[in-house]
């Protein structure tokens, strides 16, 4: 037996093959390949066990592309959704570009009742493409959802190939099917490409989306009317036409091969077109040469980016409020990039440095002056740290929210706090508090939290920029701050990163000019020059210039917002995995080796070759700019909220980074006018800041970015926590991470409830109960094999379940058992345990309670949990008759233990 020595460790060929399988999964290499590499004289262990790199041969695309769509029906009682119809249309892309109305080149080509049949049709297209040697494109308008049914595409799934551009970390936006060397069929997400709903696309192209009755629950075995098919085909035609009409806006798109994967790609390519070659080259060189990134700094920056401020006021959670005013910031994130300072170096590293030393004794002066006025804050930074900026890991001792009462909003996310075990271990330990009083929310760490936000803490360690630290000092009393690991940067004022700022100002001016034209006004020459010549020519020659300007306005908004996405895009995602029919990108598994390989070899190497692909990839290395844009947007909200707290009687019942919902229990016309005056004063300060910044010379009355605009007043409003609120004022606005609006229309739910209610208000309250009360949402008749994966896939429990896939909607509240009363039973240990006990009893250490979910089915309990940073799935067969709606009926653990044993 041959023994090989690597770094003083001995391996056999079998050991090396096992190591390759452990590190690379299904892409691993076998013993024969490893043996050949050793015989060639390879000495690097990583090179010996790394996967084979398959060269993908570039082939031409067929000009014929397809758009497919599923029609789904939701069961309100079980929250289960299944497909009952699929339609496909095809179009000639080249003809669509040259035809005034591309609607005429789109034609229906296939429909079926079961997802499996659609998979067979796609396999036929795959074989045709392989025979003709032309790649075929297919679009779904929400591939992340529609691909939930793809596990029934048995004939096609064997050709699935994993490519680097597969997933954005959550849902797939490109699926490649091929023979191992060449890709013959691509399925892409048109929603990622267009950033619009089908209804919005229809309005834009003049072919509106049809109306449809979603109240009726339909199955694949039900007879459908002609209109059902027309509706589905129309959605496909609208999407296909929208793709071609979008591509007409860009002069550099000549054929189907030029269609980018996402809308951000549109913007990246347009950047190169609108900036001079010298500026584009300078910007690309600047990002790479100035910000060489290492793994540790990237992990810190990812931590800094986490911890959004989205939050609901704990004193008003679940309560029905009337006359709630909504204020929204116009292009909050990208507007910050046109006004603020950014780092101009990668940063000098400091370790275990007291923050006071870096701030040269001006700490108190900073607290007193810079937080009172946003303009002063800009000036104070340069006095404070001599024009330096910093980000890193900070330890805060004895922190406590300043204003405990109705009008306070904590901003330190519990998910952003870090344990003392190491840089990579995030400590969540967030309790499922429900509606308990705040005084009861004390954990064993002397931490007081409110719905995932820190109220007080003896000691916590967080990732932050100095902007975040200033935000914290405004909202919290802090005994001391020290920096465990700090990157100190020089702040580049007087224009900041000129290329970045110039690029964003062009988009800002474009948006402002198009808004003026769509309102029948004539913008000045400076603003007009920012509009692309083709767009301006089309508007002038169009019979309805305001309507066309509005269409281009929406496009410019998406481009402007995409700029923030470009800057804040993560540099490296984890490996793409296939697990139980579910395809995910495991961001938790990012290793130092993976980062170094991707960042240094791919981004830097390709960038220095000055290829187009390299230049675009290098733009992503402005990640640090995205971090500061986010921090500035958060500070914008903190300053606004502090003004509301101190200058008005209004209460913020809900906020996210670019909006706030304000409520006054005894409002009058006087108090509302006072509120508007205070908001107006704040907006004037934004204009002053913009004028004093050296990034751009703007006319105050022409620049509307960064202002808090009054949107509307809701007759009824209620919020539970982050990203979960409902508002009603004639039309229902629902934002929730649990109720999927695309598949369970809230208007349908209201109609359903209205039949049993006397008013819309009663319906609204009933919908609150359905959305946010566990015991009204769970139905233990749900049965059938369940795939506990990222999409929570399931199967309909009926006679045609083998043909029709169904998904249980991704949610953070349905089927979720309270942690204190949650039961856990395994085949190895015939016992029921409290959740707090099971962590160490079964797994040996604490589970991540924030991301552990229990799912109940007739056959037993499914658990999706995270352990040591990895997602695991366990299904425990057991008798769930002792449960009702996820709540333990009996307090006697011994009774249940005997039953299950």
Where are these regions (language model features)?
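Short, basic interhelical loop/turn and adjoining N-cap
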Residues: 21-36
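Short alpha-helical "recognition helix" segments of helix-turn-helix
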Residues: 16-23, 901
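A short acidic-Thr-Gly-centered motif at the start of a beta-strand
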Residues: 53-64, 126-131, 302-325, 642-646
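C-terminal, non-catalytic extensions of nucleic-acid polymerases
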Residues: 247-316, 400-652, 662-901
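Two-metal-ion RNase H-like nuclease active-site motif
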Residues: 63-74, 325-327
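Conserved DEDDh/DEDDy metal-dependent 3′-5′ exonuclease domain
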Residues: 98-220, 224, 230-238
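Short active-site loop/helix that positions an aromatic residue
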Residues: 147-156, 244, 330-345, 666
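Acidic, Mg2+-coordinating catalytic module of metal-dependent nucleases/exonucleases
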Residues: 199-285, 637, 658
């Amino acid at each position: 037996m041959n023994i090989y020595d690597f770094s003083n460790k001995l391996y056999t060929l079998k050991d090396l093959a096992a190591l390759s399988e452990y590190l690379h999964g299904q892409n691993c290499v076998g013993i024969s390949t490893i043996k050949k590499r050793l015989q060639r004289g390879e000495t690097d262990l990583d090179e010996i066990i790394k996967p084979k790199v398959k060269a993908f041969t570039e082939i031409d695309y067929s000009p014929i592309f397809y758009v497919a769509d599923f029609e789904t029906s939701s069961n309100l009682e079980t929250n289960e959704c299944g497909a009952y119809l699929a339609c496909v249309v095809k179009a000639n892309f080249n003809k669509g570009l040259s035809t005034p109305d591309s609607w005429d080149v789109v034609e229906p080509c296939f429909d079926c009742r079961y997802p499996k049949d659609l998979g067979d049709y796609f396999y036929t297209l795959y074989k045709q493409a392989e025979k003709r040697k032309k790649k075929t494109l297919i679009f779904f308008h929400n591939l992340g959802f529609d691909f939930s049914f793809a596990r029934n595409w048995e004939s096609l799934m064997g050709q699935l190939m994993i490519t680097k551009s597969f997933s954005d970390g959550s849902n797939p936006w490109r699926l490649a099917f091929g023979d191992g060397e060449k890709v013959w069929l691509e399925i892409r997400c048109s929603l990622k490409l267009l950033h619009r709903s089908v209804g919005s696309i229809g309005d834009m192209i003049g072919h509106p989306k049809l109306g449809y009755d979603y109240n009726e629950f339909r199955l694949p075995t039900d007879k459908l009317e002609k209109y059902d098919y027309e509706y589905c085909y129309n959605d496909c035609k609208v999407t296909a036409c929208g793709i071609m009409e979008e591509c007409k806006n860009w002069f550099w798109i000549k054929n189907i091969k030029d269609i980018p994967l996402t809308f951000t790609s549109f913007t990246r390519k347009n950047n190169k077109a609108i900036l001079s070659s010298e500026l584009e080259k300078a910007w690309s060189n600047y990002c790479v040469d100035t910000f060489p990134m290492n793994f540790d700094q990237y992990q810190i920056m990812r931590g800094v980016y986490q911890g959004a401020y989205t939050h609901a006021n704990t004193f008003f959670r679940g309560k029905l409020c009337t006359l709630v005013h909504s204020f929204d910031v116009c292009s909050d994130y990208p507007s910050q990039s046109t006004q603020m300072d950014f780092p101009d170096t990668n940063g000098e590293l400091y370790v275990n440095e007291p923050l006071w030393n870096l701030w040269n004794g001006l700490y108190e002066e900073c607290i007193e002056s810079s937080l009172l006025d946003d303009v002063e804050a800009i000036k104070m930074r340069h006095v404070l740290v001599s024009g330096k900026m910093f980000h890193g890991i900070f330890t805060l001792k004895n922190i406590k929210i300043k204003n405990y009462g109705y009008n306070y909003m904590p901003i330190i996310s519990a998910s952003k706090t870090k344990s003392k075990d190491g840089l990579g271990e995030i400590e969540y330990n967030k309790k499922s508090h429900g509606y308990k009083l705040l005084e009861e929310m004390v954990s064993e760490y002397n931490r007081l939290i409110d719905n995932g936000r820190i109220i007080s803490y003896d000691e916590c360690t967080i990732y932050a920029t100095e902007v975040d630290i200033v935000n914290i000092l405004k909202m919290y009393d802090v005994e001391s701050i020290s920096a465990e690991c700090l990157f100190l940067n020089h702040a580049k004022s007087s224009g900041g990163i000129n290329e970045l700022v110039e690029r964003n100002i062009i988009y800002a001016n474009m948006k402002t000019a198009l808004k003026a034209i769509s309102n029948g006004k004539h913008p000045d020459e400076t603003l007009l020059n920012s509009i692309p010549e083709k767009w301006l020519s089309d508007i002038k020659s169009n019979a309805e210039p305001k309507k066309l300007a509005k269409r281009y306005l929406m496009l410019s908004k998406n481009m402007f917002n995409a700029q923030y996405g470009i800057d804040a895009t993560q540099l490296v995602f984890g490996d793409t995995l296939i697990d139980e029919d579910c395809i995910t990108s495991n961001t938790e598994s990012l290793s130092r080796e993976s980062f170094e390989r991707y960042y240094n070899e791919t981004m830097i190497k390709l960038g220095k070759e000055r290829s187009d692909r390299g230049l675009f990839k290098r733009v992503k290395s402005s990640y640090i700019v995205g971090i500061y844009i986010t921090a500035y947007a958060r500070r914008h909200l903190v300053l606004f909220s502090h003004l509301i707290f101190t200058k008005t009687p209004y209460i913020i019942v809900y906020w996210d980074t670019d909006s706030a919902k304000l409520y006054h229990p005894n409002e009058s016309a006087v108090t509302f006018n006072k509120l508007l005056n205070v908001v107006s004063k704040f907006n004037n300060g934004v204009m002053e800041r913009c004028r004093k910044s050296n990034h751009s010379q703007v006319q105050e009355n022409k620049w509307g970015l960064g202002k808090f605009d009054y949107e509307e007043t809701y007759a009824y409003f209620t919020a539970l926590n982050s990203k979960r609120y409902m508002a009603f004022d004639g039309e229902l606005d629902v934002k929730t991470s649990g109720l999927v609006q695309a598949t369970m229309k809230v208007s349908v739910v209201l109609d359903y409830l209205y039949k049993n209610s006397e008013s819309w208000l009663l319906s609204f309250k009933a919908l609150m109960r359905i959305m946010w009360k566990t015991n009204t949402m769970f139905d233990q008749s749900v049965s059938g094999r369940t795939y506990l994966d990222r999409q929570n896939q399931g199967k309909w429990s009926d006679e045609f379940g083998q043909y029709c896939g169904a998904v249980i909607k991704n949610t953070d509240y349905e089927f979720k058992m309270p942690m204190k009363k949650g039961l856990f039973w395994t085949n190895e240990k015939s016992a029921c345990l409290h959740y707090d006990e099971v962590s160490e009893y079964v797994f040996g250490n604490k589970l991540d309670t924030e991301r552990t979910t229990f799912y109940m089915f007739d056959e037993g309990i499914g658990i999706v949990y995270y352990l040591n940073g990895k997602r695991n799935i366990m299904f425990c067969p057991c008798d769930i008759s002792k449960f009702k709606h996820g709540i333990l009926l009996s307090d006697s653990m011994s009774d249940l233990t005997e039953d299950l044993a």
